[in-house]
């Protein structure tokens, strides 16, 4: 589904790739949309587990955790297999108007992802920029927007460097917010 998109991937292709009969597919899933919801949830759960192991969580200073989170995403784009995209972002772009149940699952995953960053931002703000007027909630969603946009642009340009550059700009922006 990540390679071709939800709409272009047929149940027959899913069954062939999984080595299942159509009968087996429909025994376990109500239909393709049910599978789509479960795939989105599984994709996010897998990413969340990977993310939970990131070293920045060990940092005592919340500002270092904030910057470390961005650095973690930058490093992920340098790996031997840079991200080819985000299934959640792909699903939302393709299905937001036609499959509200899948869109809702993706929105919940994005919100959950932003919550951890928001908490670190709130702690960093209280410690390092108590008079700042920016919203930790809005800024945490801004990271999602930048990351999703960078993934799309990296695909369009076929160059993961775009991800590093976009996140590097965001990191610089964050540092400037804490210097005000």
Place the predicted regions along the sequence by residue.
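Hydrophobic alpha-helical bundle segments that form small-molecule/ligand-binding pockets
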Residues: 98-102, 111-139, 176-180
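Short, well-structured alpha-helical segments
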Residues: 67, 136-144
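Helix-turn-helix
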Residues: 2-34, 38
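Alpha-helical structural segments
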Residues: 3, 17, 34-57, 64-79, ...
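Short coil/turn segments at alpha/beta junctions that flank glycine-rich nucleotide-binding fingerprints
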Residues: 3-7, 58, 84, 127
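Amphipathic alpha-helical segments used for helix-helix packing
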Residues: 65, 80-101
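Amphipathic C-terminal alpha-helical segment
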Residues: 76, 123, 144-161, 173-180
């Amino acid at each position: 589904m990540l390679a071709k998109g939800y709409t272009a991937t047929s149940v027959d292709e899913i069954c062939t790739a999984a080595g299942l009969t159509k009968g087996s597919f429909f025994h376990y899933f109500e239909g393709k949309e049910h599978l789509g919801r479960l795939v989105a949830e599984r994709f996010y759960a897998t990413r969340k587990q990977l993310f939970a192991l990131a070293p920045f969580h060990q940092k005592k200073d919340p500002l270092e955790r904030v910057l470390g989170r961005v650095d973690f995403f930058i490093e992920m784009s340098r790996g031997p297999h840079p991200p080819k995209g985000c299934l959640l972002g792909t699903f939302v772009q393709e299905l937001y108007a036609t499959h509200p149940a899948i869109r809702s699952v993706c929105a919940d995953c994005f919100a959950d992802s932003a919550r951890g960053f928001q908490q670190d931002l709130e702690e960093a703000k209280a410690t390092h920029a108590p008079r700042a007027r920016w919203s930790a909630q809005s800024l945490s969603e801004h990271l999602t927007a930048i990351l999703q946009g960078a993934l799309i642009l990296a695909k369009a340009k076929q160059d993961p460097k775009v991800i590093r550059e976009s996140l590097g700009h965001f990191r610089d922006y964050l540092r400037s917010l804490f210097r005000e």
